[in-house]
């Protein structure tokens, strides 16, 4: 009797794992993983989230309202002069989306993959590798979005979002978080130990400092500017800055497309890696 029940369950799981795209890749249950992460998150330390929220606020107070008093106005990419605080706010908003998404899609994923052995258990159910990828990336996206919304609620009443187009900064931050989370999880799937994880921070810090976050990239030689423009955070900063300052142009469509490509590439490689690691 028990053998019959177990066999029947195995058959049903195998059928579900065939999924909508075949080969056990997708069963349409990514939302269950997001729900699982939320339930686990409710019992975790909220200080982690609070620290991610207050970090950009501290940068704003120190640089925007502190050093900004000494600097005065800054000329943006369209030739308009804005206050220094208004100049760095969209960059800090984009950085918040990036940091929240990267944290969950790298360190948390690394622990689940190599120590918690959670993905092995998940992929033994009806979940497919794309379900896991979408679920984890979706959760990381929500974290990045939460940071961005919290920061917007702080800076908007201060008059640091001069354009009504700034309302679209939240959907923009969602796109940014989705892109970073997708690539972050894909990169993490190749990491074998904590020492290799340090390479992520090694890349993130200079990108944060030199991507037009605190000053225009025009201060650099032309060849360095081209390198910076290729960085995802610079694309994010330019997208959000254009929205919050009301400087809309065709280049913003290119910035958005950049993250669409990031999302597609990240999902593809993450799904491939999870399939190769745990389902082959």
Language model feature labels by segment:
Residues 1-167, 171-280:
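Hydrophobic transmembrane alpha-helices and immediately adjacent juxtamembrane helices
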